[in-house]
């Protein structure tokens, strides 16, 4: 998992970086410089592919179709971030991936509604399986790492709406992948240094 992340960070750092542009406060303050926001968004997509690759490589699990799907019995289409099956347990895992759970007031209910809507669709699509759904926040190793009341409040808001938040360590346990908290945060710091180079 970590090796793939380092490889991808090196690849991204060698590509032409998007620069801050006139109209942004960063540009006004410091002029054109490498857009860290763009790098974070790009690496967020890499995280999604890293998790999917890990699931493909883990015996007993099967990656299911993700991406934009038409919801059963509706004209709506929604994007499914991560969907996989524990073959032995007949457990479907659906996760909306968020690298930043500090969502603004409007996005939190919309994200919660999306997860619940998709979970109903998936229950109809996979009636012979148990569904485990929620949000996966890969920027945090474990919920105990969150000390800010603001973050804890966001988690309570999601959970009170019926949507659980899981973290990197949760998916690592599910996939029997051994990565310590120290290794995980060291990995992210390495990625950050590479992307800023």
Task: Please give the residue ranges for each predicted region.
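P-loop NTPase nucleotide-binding core
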Residues: 33, 72-73, 162
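A short acidic/basic microdomain associated with nuclease active sites
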Residues: 53-76
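Interdomain/boundary linker segments immediately adjacent to catalytic/signaling cores
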Residues: 1-59
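Short secondary-structure capping micro-motifs at structural edges
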Residues: 36-40, 68-72, 78-84, 118-123
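Catalytic cores of nucleic-acid endonucleases
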Residues: 97-158
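Conserved catalytic cores of phosphodiester-cleaving nucleases, focusing on short active-site segments
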Residues: 55, 80-101
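Short, solvent-exposed loop/turn segments that connect beta-strands within catalytic domains
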Residues: 75, 87-91, 127
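Non-catalytic C-terminal interaction segments of nucleic acid-processing enzymes
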Residues: 1, 14, 151-197
């Amino acid at each position: 998992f970590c090796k793939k992340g380092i490889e991808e960070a090196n690849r991204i750092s060698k590509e032409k970086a998007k620069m801050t542009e006139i109209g942004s406060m960063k540009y006004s303050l410091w002029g054109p410089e490498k857009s860290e926001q763009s790098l974070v968004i790009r690496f967020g997509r890499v995280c999604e592919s890293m998790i999917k690759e890990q699931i493909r490589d883990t015996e007993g699990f099967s990656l299911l179709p993700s991406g934009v799907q038409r919801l059963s019995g509706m004209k709506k289409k929604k994007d499914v971030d991560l969907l996989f099956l524990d073959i032995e347990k007949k457990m479907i895992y659906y996760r909306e991936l968020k690298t930043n759970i500090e969502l603004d007031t409007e996005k939190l209910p919309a994200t919660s509604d999306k997860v619940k809507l998709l979970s109903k669709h998936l229950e109809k699509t996979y009636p012979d399986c148990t569904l485990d759904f929620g949000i996966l926040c890969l920027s945090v190793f474990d919920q105990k790492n969150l000390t800010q009341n603001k973050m804890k409040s966001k988690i309570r808001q999601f959970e009170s709406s019926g949507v659980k938040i899981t973290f990197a360590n949760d998916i690592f346990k599910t996939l029997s992948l051994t990565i310590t908290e120290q290794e995980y945060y060291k990995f992210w710091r390495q990625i950050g240094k590479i992307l800023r180079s």
